[in-house]
Amino acid sequence: MEGDWEQLGLTLLNTDDDNNIVLFSSTDELSDFRNRLDAYEGPTPAGQKNPSYSGFINRIGSISTLEPRDRLGIRIKEAGFTEVSDLQDGQEYILDVELWEFGTQAARRRKAEEIIAFIEEQGGELYDHYSGPSITMIRVKASGQSIRPIFSVPEVAFIDLPPEPDIEANQIVQFALDDVPPVAPLDPDLPIIAVLDTGVNDHPFLADAIVAREAFPSELGEADIAGHGTAVAGVAALGDLRSQLDGTSLQRVARIISAKVVTDERKFFDRRTLPSQMRQTIQSLNASHGCRIFVISLGDTKANFEQGRVGPWATTLDELARELNVLIFVSAGNRPPRGGTSVEQGVTQYPGYLRGGRRNSDQLLRWIV
């Protein structure tokens, strides 16, 4: 049916599991579409059993325009906002404004700049403007009265609170150095893996394997206060440590770049959109260190509820993987009840988690490069 919409000058923007679709028209008049409706409602042509275009029109349940409240994102709705009017005058909000993927990238950028100009005229502040191949998003700090009109802009897809990382570090297992095999000398030709996380602390197993410590942006610092990034770096550098404890030495399988992208308070940096932060980090490390393997063990608990679409974070990673010819590994399925802490779960449960009973399982698979 998408071909039918294209013939009418309509662009398919979004679908969901309830068979609702969002279309964008290049003209306000919708002349071609209205002509088909008029023909359908008119007399049945001679020699035909059914009205004109009945095969097309009968598949449509109802037609309506998007309302401002339809643009409320999942996070802001879960925060208790059910109507645009819930955004209060005099109250400031930090919000992500995402545009539909309409027209050209330049056209989307111009529309974003118009929205930015309006918000700034109302006393709001621009935090970030990301204009990528598919995703166009701005992050603003604005009052209720200055952001409410943006919910009525047709080109706006969603307005939402910024995402938050789902970080849970496992309990630390302590070993005395005398109780584990010695660390084997590091092979200088080992591949480099960039760990985009909470930072990486000093550790005797990792000390000579750390190629660089960087933060994006730099004001995040380098220390791993949460402890999550250090654990992820250990897995990247050593694999399954348990399998090596009975050996004669600990073998590293990779060198590590620590790329800190999370604050010490376990939040994403509030002055950057996630697409902007991911693109800056991955492009920079690829250019400066030739890094082609990236690990992102940071979840977004709301990503499963992106309303029938691939979200901006996943889309940006897909684009970067293609543009730079890099591998990006993203954790999935390692939350209760599937903890992913045993090898058996990877065989017996994880494949079903990806494939079984989910109409949007292809979206999950897009995260695995």
Labelled PLM ranges:
Residues 1-118, 126, 130-131, 156-185, ...:
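Autoinhibitory N-terminal propeptides
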Residues 34, 204-210, 218, 304-309, ...:
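A short acidic (Asp/Glu
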Residues 90-92, 96-102, 196-198, 258-264, ...:
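Short loop/turn segments at strand-loop or loop-helix junctions that form parts
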Residues 110, 114, 145, 263-368:
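Substrate-binding/access-modulating region of protease and related hydrolase catalytic domains
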Residues 130-143:
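Aromatic/histidine-rich interaction motifs
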